[in-house]
Structures are given as structure tokens and as C-alpha cells.
Amino acid sequence: MRAISRLTGASFNTISKLMIDAGKACAAYHHENVVGVSAERIERDEIWSFTYSKQKNVKTAKAAPEGAGDTWTWTALDADSKLIVSYLVGGRDSSYANAFMEDVASRLTNRVQLTTDVHKAYLEAVEGAFGYDVDYAQLVKMYGKLSLIHI
């Protein structure tokens, strides 16, 4: 934002307010228009970031604001169209998982194949939001040295 301020000559506060207003407008547009989605495959994941400082440094940070620390952006993506069906910014616990999955389910019109990682909070959240009206899979990500199998 400082670079935008320097390039445009607009004050940093003006740029900040514009970004906040644009974000609110985009969120309202998404909430009102991304409904009744007919999708076949939904991929779910979360992205880690931090607000002000990493969680481990919040206690020693100078004047850390409320909400400082780890921040997670939950996303639900239509695997075919790449539409973000739903998103949520917050923590990574079961209360956020439940709220997020309820929102995802409310935006869909049909039974979907839903894929998540193995975060334990998903099991209860998916069942609570979709009941039995979902084909659910957890993708286990395996890291490390690859082994090639010759046939």
C-alpha cells in the first residue's frame, strides 16, 4: 500500500480506506451472488498466514492488537470452474470448520464430491453440514523422497 501511495500521490490512509471499502464490496457481492451453485467436485483447503505477527511471537510483541497471530483462510473451490464457492478468514478449530461447512453446503444445489485434507475438524463439520448427502474423501498428503515403482 505504501508503494501505491508513492506512485499515485494519494495518502496512505486514503489507500487503506479504499482497500477496506473494496474488500467489503467484494464480500457483499460474493455473498449475494455465489448461491445456487451446481458443482460436481469441491476441493477444500485452508491457507495459513498471520496478522501482525506469528502466534508464537504475540506475547512478546509490542502493542499487538486484538486478533494478532495465526490467521487461516478457509476455501472451497469448484474443481472444474475454479470458482471460489465459499471462504472464511479466522482460526483453525472446529467452530470455524462447522461454520464454514454450513456456508459451503448452503451455496450448493446438488450432491457433490467433497475432498479435504485430514484436519480432524472436517469429519464432524462435513457430517453436520451435509449429513449423508455428500460423497466425502480425505486426501492424505505424503511428503518425502519419491519411490518409483517399475512395472
Predicted regions located by residue number:
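Short, well-ordered alpha-helical microsegments
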Residues: 97, 122-124
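Two-metal-ion RNase H-like nuclease active-site motif
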Residues: 37-66, 75
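Inter-helix linker motif
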Residues: 135-145
